[in-house]
Amino acid sequence: MRDRLMLLSGWAFGPAALEPLAELLRERGPHLQVDIVSLPTLGDPDAWLDELDARLPADRWLAGWSLGGMLATQLAARRGDACNGLITLCSNPCFRSRDDWPAAMPAEVFEAFHAAFRLGPEETRKRFSLLASRGGFDARTLARQLEVSRLECPVAALDAGLQLLAALDGREAMRRFVGPQLHLFAGNDALVPAAAAQALLDWLPDVEVDVIENASHALPLERAEDIATAMLAFMQRGEED
């Protein structure tokens, strides 16, 4: 079904953060069925991809925000022709920097954040909302909107999500998936540096990559209209190919 899209949420946030984008996609693409998918709430990070694969129907477009995009990438590579195309929003192939992928959050910054989360999950989640909204036009309002959309789930599941953010490397999955790919980044993102866009394009020049300037990591919430326009145009091109 080429008119169906599964939209995966980001770490610690529920469907509400993606609902404005989903509504615009439905309004502007009346034949498009859009389903927002919450991330797994399992304490075992190794089980997340299998859980998503079992829960999400095949023959859909896969899209995701941040960690959701990283997982959508892995799932697209696993499904191959059973995935119509891949769209990621503020998703770095490697969220934490590596020697061969420096365009990411410095490893020591990530480790400090993860340690802080284990000591004080509630305070760290609030800090994450502030970081996700930093660089936006109205960061304070964005942070409040993100707080309202927080996913209520076990701390162990949130910790598993952080483990995945540290461990996942989507480069090989992107290379293996031969369907259409669109990767959108935010120019003022405080969590995924905009430099990752050029790094990705240099590494995999056959995919579509763009940077939405003057936008924060909360890209699908802050710039829903721009993202909906870009996604629908990309999907239309994919169906024409």
What does each model-identified segment do?
Residues M1-D46:
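Conserved HGGG/HGGXW glycine-rich cap/lid loop of the alpha/beta-hydrolase fold
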Residues W11, G187-D189, N214-S216:
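Acidic beta-to-alpha connecting loop that harbors the catalytic carboxylate
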Residues G64-G68, A72:
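Gly/Ala-rich beta-loop-alpha elbow adjacent to hydrolase catalytic centers
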Residues C83-A116, A157-A160:
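Flexible "cap/lid" loop of the alpha/beta hydrolase fold
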Residues L119-A173:
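Conserved alpha/beta-hydrolase catalytic His-Asp/Glu region
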Residues F177, H183-F185, D189:
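Short beta-strand/loop motif that positions the catalytic acidic residue
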Residues A190-A196:
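Conserved alpha/beta-hydrolase "acid-adjacent" motif
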Residues A215-A228:
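Catalytic histidine-centered segment of alpha/beta-hydrolase-like enzymes
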